[in-house]
């Protein structure tokens, strides 16, 4: 009962989630998809989302009623389905862009990625690792691509590994 906060597996929590839970009560909340935003299109990104099953039954009911048609309409994208259904029902709000950020676009942008290690903006609550580098690659440093090059990222080791181990105990990982 109450809101559900969902995460992809390729994210790291770096700040308090209280603001995400309090943002726009009664609305589905997602971050604006980076690629769709650049193209001027309205679509949420599914890496972090909040909804309430009791307040947003249409997310399940419409899909259950005609799954094939709904998947076709959303072009196979669960984030397009979720965000557009909520928009159609006037219960959608974007998460502020500085709360849920992209490692490659916001922490480690080209060409600065060659000059300094990735930075963690102070307002960031969640960092998403969509594409390369993957989280383990970013910790160690990544040399697989000109624009995705990353120096060793110590703050990621701290937030993703060390704090998780402290929370879950030495037997983790």
Feature locations, PLM:
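GT-A fold catalytic core of metal-dependent nucleotide-sugar glycosyltransferases
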Residues: 1-43, 50-51
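Catalytic core and acceptor-binding pocket of nucleotide-sugar-dependent glycosyltransferases
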Residues: 57-173
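Short, surface-exposed, charged loop/turn segments at secondary-structure junctions
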Residues: 21-22, 40, 47-49, 65, ...
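Conserved nucleotide-sugar donor-binding
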Residues: 46-60
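Residues that flank catalytic or metal-binding motifs in active/ligand-binding sites
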Residues: 7, 43-47, 78, 122-123
């Amino acid at each position: 009962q109450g809101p559900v906060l969902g995460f992809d597996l390729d994210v790291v929590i770096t700040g308090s989630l209280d603001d995400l839970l309090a943002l726009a009560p009664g609305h589905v909340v997602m971050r604006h998809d980076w690629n769709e935003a650049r193209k001027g299109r309205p679509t949420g990104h599914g890496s972090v989302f909040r909804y309430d099953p009791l307040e947003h039954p249409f997310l399940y009911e419409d899909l259950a009623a005609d799954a094939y048609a709904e998947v076709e309409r959303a072009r196979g994208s669960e984030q397009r389905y979720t965000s557009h259904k909520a928009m159609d029902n006037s219960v959608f709000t974007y998460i502020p862009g500085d709360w849920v950020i992209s490692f490659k676009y916001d922490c480690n942008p080209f060409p600065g990625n060659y000059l300094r290690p990735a930075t963690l903006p102070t307002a960031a609550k969640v960092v998403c690792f969509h594409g390369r580098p993957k989280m383990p690659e970013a910790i160690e440093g990544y040399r697989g691509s000109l624009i995705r090059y990353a120096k060793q990222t110590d703050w990621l080791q701290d937030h993703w590994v060390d704090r998780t181990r402290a929370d879950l105990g030495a037997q983790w990982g």
